[in-house]
Amino acid sequence: MSLDLTTLFTKKVTVVGDVMLDSYWTGPSNRISPEAPVPVVRVTGNEDRAGGAANVAINIAKLGAPCNLVGIVGEDKNAATLEGLVRAHEINPNFVITNTHPTITKLRILSRNQQLLRLDFEDNFADVDTKGIIEAFESSLNDSKVVIFSDYGKGSLASVQQMIQICRQKGIYSLVD
């Protein structure tokens, strides 16, 4: 099978992998905390962005390809925020929801264009039942010609070999981010 890259983004693409929410809190820092030798940031702004595989899907959509997104999220507010971010780019999210893990979230605190701290809210999804992700993956393949696997080592692609085999059986191109 050969893939004509000039027409790649006219075909439906399914992105599957580790989806996450990137949050940025920003503000000035003009003093050191009296409690510990750390800067105090007066938060004046915040922004949420799609991260990981969700960012890959947004980039694909911006190139003009219709796009599905498959990943695992928690049963929480951050999952709803992430879903809204990808839907804003006309991406069809097919998230597997688990109530045992939070949505992977990276919270960065910035001041004066400098990252001061990053807080990671995550558990590895490798122990989540893979049946759900396989079912979500297969149901997202309708009309897809290309699958992009986006692995950040968070466990969403624990069954990647099975997913690649499904792509081979269906004649779908597989790419790795």
Write out the residue ranges for each language-model feature:
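Ribokinase/PfkB-type carbohydrate-kinase core domain
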Residues: 1-30, 45-177
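Flexible glycine/proline-rich, aromatic-decorated loop/lid segments
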Residues: 31-35
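Divalent-cation-assisted or electrostatically stabilized phosphate/pyrophosphate-binding catalytic cores
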Residues: 37-44
